[in-house]
Amino acid sequence: MDVILLERISKLGQMGETVKVRDGFARNYLLPLGKALRANAANKTRFEAERATLEARNLERKSEAQKVADVLDGKSFIVVRSAGETGQLYGSVAARDVVEILAAEGFNIGRNQVHLNTPIKAIGLHKVELQLHAEVEIHVELNVARSAEEAERQSKGEELTSVDAIYGVDEDALRPEDFFDPEADGVDEDEA
């Protein structure tokens, strides 16, 4: 089906272009959401008559998204979740959670604007892409940790999955005095 795009759609085209799309995509997504019109003579003249208002509305949306992007871009958010000793989360951080975190900070972002290929399932620093407008894309950082103190340590570059980081204990001090380590330096091969 041929449609006239009423706004820029990534990987499809710019506003005003006539593009060929699958019937289901047009009927179930583009037409109901007002992102496109069927490409016929009547709709082409209608689009040309409304082109100036559509461009003004698109520019207004883009400027609003750019204002939010200027505040959010590169910002870091702390996410406290339960996790095991290896750093594996008991659950995950999904797009829904990112939206809730941003809403708590006063930003109104839709779930469809958060681009996570897979949910976050481990503690650490994770970059998340936000598509605020078809032409405005930013990244925020999620600092996923077991506590606020760990998040602070993690933001300074500390590794939190070792025994020392978890318990505050030196691993070497836990070894018995007569512990034999075949990989340690100074072991004479004749003795072994």
Curated annotation (Swiss-Prot):
Domain of life: Bacteria
Gene Ontology annotations of biological process type: translation
Disordered: annotated span: 172-192
Listed Gene3D superfamilies: Ribosomal protein L9, C-terminal domain, Ribosomal protein L9, N-terminal domain
Keywords (A to Z) from UniProt: Ribonucleoprotein, Ribosomal protein, RNA-binding, rRNA-binding
GO CC, any one term: ribosome
PROSITE patterns, per the entry: RIBOSOMAL_L9
Pfam families reported for this sequence: Ribosomal_L9_C, Ribosomal_L9_N
InterPro entries: Ribosomal_bL9, Ribosomal_bL9/RNase_H1_N, Ribosomal_bL9_bac/chp, Ribosomal_bL9_C, Ribosomal_bL9_C_sf, Ribosomal_bL9_N, Ribosomal_bL9_N_sf
Keyword hit for Ligase: no
Biased composition (Acidic residues): 179-192
Record carries keyword Aminoacyl-tRNA synthetase: no
Gene Ontology terms for molecular function: rRNA binding; structural constituent of ribosome
SUPFAM superfamilies: L9 N-domain-like, Ribosomal protein L9 C-domain
Described purpose of this protein according to its UniProt entry: Binds to the 23S rRNA.
Homology family: Belongs to the bacterial ribosomal protein bL9 family.
Protein name: Large ribosomal subunit protein bL9
